[in-house]
Amino acid sequence: MKTFKLLASTLVVLLLGFSVTTAEQTMQKKEAFIKQINGCYTSYYKVHTGDVTIPNVFVTAIAIHESGWGTSRFAKEGHNYFGIRTTATDPKHFMIAGGDAKVKVAKYDSMCDNVEYFINLIAYDPRYSDVADYFKQNKQVTDYKEVLSYMNIYHEDPLWPNKVAGIISSLQNF
């Protein structure tokens, strides 16, 4: 009986140690992902100045949501962290989403290429002019739910704005 208790205690200690290590590793991976996105963001704005700045936390939160912290197939195989679709016809420039040949997800050469594309999309594409205008007029954003509600053409999930707003909130406390 003593041997069983000792074995059980040892197993519990090992499992707890494994859980802590796994949690620490997960947190480190998340921090590394944020740093990578932030590095691309900073590089973009060192070169590009304009009348609209898309907030870093906005870009990062959408990348986190759309790519599952960079773990999605599209992020890993195509450096697509924002779920950007394409009409490209050359297979080198797209991946098929979920076996549906009609849904093509764009491929990028690097994470930074995708971050640059996303920022330009939001800042300059007429379909997102309400979003760009919001950021032009509101340099200090405290509630992102309003601006996220202007992105209906970007997402299909009706809960998407709330999910991304939740990520933004958690990043502001990170």
Predicted regions and their residues:
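Bacterial Sec-dependent N-terminal signal peptides
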Residues: M1-E24
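Catalytic cores of secreted/periplasmic lytic hydrolases that degrade extracellular macromolecules
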Residues: G17-T60, H65-F174
